[in-house]
Amino acid sequence: DSVACFYPSFLHAGFSVVTPNKKAFSGSLDLFSAIEEAKQDDSKPLVYQESTVGAGLPIIGTLKDLVATGDKIKKVEGVLSGTMSYIFNEFSPAAGSTTKFSEIVSVARQNGYTEPHPGDDLSGSDVARKLTILSRLIPGLAYELPRGFASVSTQSLTPAGLADEANADVYV
């Protein structure tokens, strides 16, 4: 968040921004609007945020191209969390798995599959951010989430006692 708030200033100064930071594009509508406005400066600075959704897949570029060529986006489907996909593939009591959920989350974190703080994945915040980013690329939806990702309803998998734990090491 601390760097993302400077993106409009960077853009107004003529610098392009390349970032995997979801927070800049899924947070407050004010910051999102300021970034969009700054992109219109005479110097035409560029913003590359492709890896904010879909890691290395060209999800954002494809969606932008579809919109730019006049296609109407009716729905977007996909697995929006590789972390949750991994965790649920590993945690399968029906298949006889005896590994604790917390151990699977810990392994996922050690392997670099989770966000820096796994609570972002387990709370639903990471998916809510990605949904917000995608919706803001679609005309008619761009300004529908005034509180950003906080406007998206989620259901957390985090136990109540850990929900506010800021230290990722303690959380896991």
Where on the chain are the PLM-derived regions?
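Structured alpha-helical segments in the cores of large, soluble enzyme domains
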Residues: 1-7, 100-105
